[in-house]
């Protein structure tokens, strides 16, 4: 970009017609936007919002950075009066070109400007503001969410399917936490109401952290599948009204959930790996997040600085470790309705003395359908319970004979592991004590 010149210097460089007037050309319009003292460097393309911005004062009062219709009217007036340029279409074309040559991303600029002071905060943040437990799970959950947000800012469209869900009573500050975590209020939104809206991109556009509160509060088995599918998307395909063709809009945002109800997750025995619930206890919080908003925002800025250190190191994955995944699956059951059928089957197996069971047997004897024949979906449900919820039983696929149920696939009781590395010790008289479980060698 060339340095700004005076109005007279700019006028002297403009192309003219044969009659000496200013030529109404895109080149002349570009010259003004690139060199004029008021306009040079003023127009930029905001990668986050996918819009053109005015990023420096240009002589009239403005409410926001985004280029508006009112701004265009002022610009048209200024170019006409100062430079004799009157072609609205060519002025708009020049604005598009100069904006494309001057791109910026406000979130990237913010994150790159941070310097971490070396104090660990991510591990203690949810305790500090919301009274959550200080443990590895809570730390890994928030760290993963923040790294996902950073990655989406620097690499739009990156695969990240995780939703951090804050669970606790009303007034705990859950929504406020997500709003302040987004740093600027305009980078936060809680206005996403429908996932099948053709204009959903407009709801995501320009935002970094989006809270899904109402949808989580009313989630059922069907809607939770829709939310899962929505979270899995990496882009939206959308045609902005003034454009001719639809285009891919890679996602630059992440999604947080809040719920006042403890059992907000519908029963899903296979697990809801996309949803990471964290229980909050506001009475245990060290401070209320709005008690000193400036201090809270400074604390959160240092959290982002800490997360940027991890991001720059490259020593992270945008997923839980296998051990944490196993913990998550168990932990999520605390946030689901009681699984009564799994409880009935477990109670039956606790008293059962046989070594094998089949699904028809469990249907009739554990679930008390003595005289009924199971439907196929009921068999699938029992299979899911046995494979996902019940421990101590292993599935076998080669059918075996059951006295009352014929040849069936099923499950066999796990054989307890024996300590072969530590043979029984001899007694004082030199004999080995034989337990009930040991076979005599004759």
Please tell me what each predicted stretch does.
Residues 38, 44-47, 53-54, 59, ...:
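Residue-level preference for alpha-helix termini and adjacent loops
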Residues 1-121, 140, 372-373, 377, ...:
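N-terminal nucleic-acid engagement/recognition segments and initiation subdomains in replication
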């Amino acid at each position: 970009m060339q340095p700004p010149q005076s109005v007279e210097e700019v006028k002297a460089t403009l192309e003219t017609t044969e009659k000496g007037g200013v030529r109404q050309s895109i080149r002349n319009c570009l010259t003004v936007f690139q060199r004029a003292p008021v306009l040079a460097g003023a127009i930029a393309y905001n990668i986050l919002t996918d819009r053109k911005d005015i990023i420096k004062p240009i002589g009239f009062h403005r409410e926001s950075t985004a280029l508006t219709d009112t701004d265009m009217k002022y610009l048209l007036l200024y170019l006409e009066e100062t430079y004799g340029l009157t072609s609205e279409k060519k002025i708009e074309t020049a604005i598009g070109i100069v904006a494309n040559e001057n791109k910026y991303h406000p979130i990237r600029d913010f994150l790159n400007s941070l310097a971490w002071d070396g104090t660990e905060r991510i591990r203690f943040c949810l305790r500090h503001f919301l009274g959550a437990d200080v443990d590895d799970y809570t730390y890994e959950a928030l760290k993963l969410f923040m790294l996902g947000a950073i990655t989406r800012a620097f690499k739009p469209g990156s695969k990240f399917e995780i939703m951090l869900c804050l669970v606790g009573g009303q007034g705990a500050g859950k929504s406020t936490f997500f709003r302040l975590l987004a740093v600027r209020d305009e980078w936060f939104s809680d206005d996403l109401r429908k996932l099948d809206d053709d204009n959903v991109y407009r709801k995501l556009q320009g935002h970094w952290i989006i809270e899904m509160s109402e949808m989580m509060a009313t989630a059922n088995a069907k809607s939770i599948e829709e939310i899962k599918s929505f979270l899995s998307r990496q882009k939206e395909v959308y045609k902005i009204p003034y454009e001719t063709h639809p285009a891919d809009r890679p996602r630059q945002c992440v999604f947080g959930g809040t719920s006042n109800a403890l059992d907000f997750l519908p029963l899903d025995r296979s697990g809801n790996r996309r949803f990471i619930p964290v229980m909050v206890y506001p009475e245990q919080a060290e401070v209320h997040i709005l008690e000193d908003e400036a201090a809270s925002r400074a604390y959160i800025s240092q959290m982002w600085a800490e997360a940027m250190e991890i991001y720059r190191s490259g020593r992270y994955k945008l997923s839980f470790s296998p051990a944490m995944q196993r913990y998550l699956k168990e932990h999520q059951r605390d946030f689901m309705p009681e699984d009564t059928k799994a409880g009935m089957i477990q109670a039956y197996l606790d008293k059962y003395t046989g070594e094998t069971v089949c699904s028809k047997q469990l249907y009739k004897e554990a679930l008390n359908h003595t005289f009924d024949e199971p439907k196929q979906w009921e068999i699938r449900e029992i299979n899911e319970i046995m494979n996902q919820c019940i421990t101590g039983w292993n599935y076998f696929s080669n059918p075996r004979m059951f006295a009352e149920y014929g040849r069936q696939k099923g499950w066999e009781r796990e054989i307890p592991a024996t300590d072969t590395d530590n043979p029984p010790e001899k007694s004082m008289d030199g004999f080995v004590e034989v337990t009930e479980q040991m076979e005599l060698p004759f």
